[in-house]
């Protein structure tokens, strides 16, 4: 195998963009730590630390990234399928997260109760109730996009605007606290490992196995590439698009439960805030085209944790939480620009010209 073929394979690797982005974030952390006189490799250090609430746990920046980035990773699974099938995005996932968290905590605490340590209903009822609301929201979005042919961004803008308000109504404009050990488990630790990361890993594994063991992944990509041709070939394009939005709502519900459990409360104003942007950015950073079609779930997951690594790095560099979205928006613009057909065609022409020139020489 010659050097040219190796370079070609690297250039065509679908995980090139997320892996390079992650390596760049690591490099920035190493340089920053060295500049302030800290251990340049402190970013990679993982230790055991004793805590009052969770006992002995794994501690370190990488562990924090894996823990804090789990909700976005869960959202990125559903967002990847939505983008692939409909060439659109679900901008309601952050608000749906908030609504699911509010409904779950309202069930667990009891309507009108602002704080409790005892559960009004069994824990499983509250958890499934919150997830069910997410599924309903996904079905609502899927119906508008697939059957009413409304543009995805416009269709999901409805719940983007309304879901948080509905959550506030359910909680009587209050932050509902559920200070219960069983409920807090989902935002805590299993042994030394963050529970949120375990839940995210299970969601990723189950989805990956489902897509690989069935033809569903191929069907979704086919619908995203050409819905008319897929319909002629016998696929129900509308049903496939409806299903992906429903699944996206399901994962938004799971992410909402994890987020609420992490803070043992339903804060409708803040849970899932800007998470839709992070989920979309994860898909784009994962090397997936926002124009639909072929997708890489692994790329989206790497992209999700890269986004969290970027967020952690920005905070370490002194960027405030209100300024961080500006930097993320710049990254989105750059990624979308790189994926733009005219720019990609330009680079292909340059590459072809170099090959012709090399052959002539």
Where are these regions (language model features)?
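Cytosolic-side transmembrane-helix boundaries in multi-pass membrane proteins
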Residues: 1-44, 228, 232, 236-239, ...
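Hydrophobic core segments of alpha-helical transmembrane domains in multi-pass membrane transport
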Residues: 17-31, 79, 131-134, 160-165, ...
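Single transmembrane alpha-helix segments in multi-pass membrane proteins
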Residues: 29, 58-111, 145-148, 283, ...
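Inter-helical junctions in multi-pass inner-membrane proteins, predominant
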Residues: 35-40, 54-64, 211, 217, ...
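Transmembrane helix-bundle core of multi-pass membrane transporters
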Residues: 43, 52, 148, 152-213, ...
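Alpha-helical transmembrane segments within multi-pass membrane transporters and channels
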Residues: 113-159, 303
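Transmembrane alpha-helical segments in multi-pass inner-membrane proteins
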Residues: 252, 263, 267-329
């Amino acid at each position: 195998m010659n050097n040219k073929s190796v370079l070609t394979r690297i250039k065509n690797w679908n995980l090139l963009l997320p892996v390079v982005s992650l390596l760049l974030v690591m490099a920035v952390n190493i340089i920053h730590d060295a500049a302030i006189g800290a251990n340049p490799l402190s970013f990679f250090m993982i230790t055991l630390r004793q805590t009052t609430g969770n006992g002995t746990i794994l501690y370190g920046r990488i562990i924090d990234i894996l823990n804090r980035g789990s909700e976005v990773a869960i959202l990125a699974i559903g967002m990847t399928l939505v983008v692939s099938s409909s060439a659109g995005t679900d901008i309601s996932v952050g608000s749906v997260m908030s609504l699911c968290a509010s409904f779950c905590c309202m069930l667990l605490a009891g309507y009108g109760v602002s704080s409790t340590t005892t559960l009004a209903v069994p824990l499983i009822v509250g958890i499934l109730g919150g997830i069910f609301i997410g599924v309903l929201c996904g079905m609502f979005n899927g119906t508008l996009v697939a059957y009413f042919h409304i543009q995805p961004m416009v269709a999901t803008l409805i719940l983007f605007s309304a879901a948080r308000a509905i959550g506030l109504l359910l909680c009587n404009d209050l932050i509902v606290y559920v200070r219960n050990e069983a409920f807090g488990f989902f935002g805590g630790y299993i042994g030394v490992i963050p529970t949120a990361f375990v839940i995210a890993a299970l969601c990723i594994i189950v989805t990956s196995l489902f897509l690989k063991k069935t033809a569903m992944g191929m069907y979704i990509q086919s619908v995203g590439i050409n819905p008319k041709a897929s319909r002629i070939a016998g696929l129900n394009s509308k049903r496939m698009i409806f299903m992906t939005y429903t699944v996206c709502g399901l994962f938004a519900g799971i992410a909402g439960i994890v987020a609420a459990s992490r803070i043992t409360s339903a804060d409708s104003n803040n849970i899932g805030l800007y998470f839709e942007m992070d989920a979309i950015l994860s898909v784009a950073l994962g090397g997936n085209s926002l124009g639909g079609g072929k997708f890489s779930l692994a790329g989206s997951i790497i992209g999700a944790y890269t986004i969290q690594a970027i967020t952690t790095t920005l905070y370490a560099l002194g960027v405030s939480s209100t300024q961080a979205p500006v930097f993320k928006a710049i990254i989105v613009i750059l990624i979308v620009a790189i994926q733009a057909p005219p720019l990609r065609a330009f680079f292909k022409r340059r590459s072809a010209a170099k090959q012709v020139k090399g052959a002539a020489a």
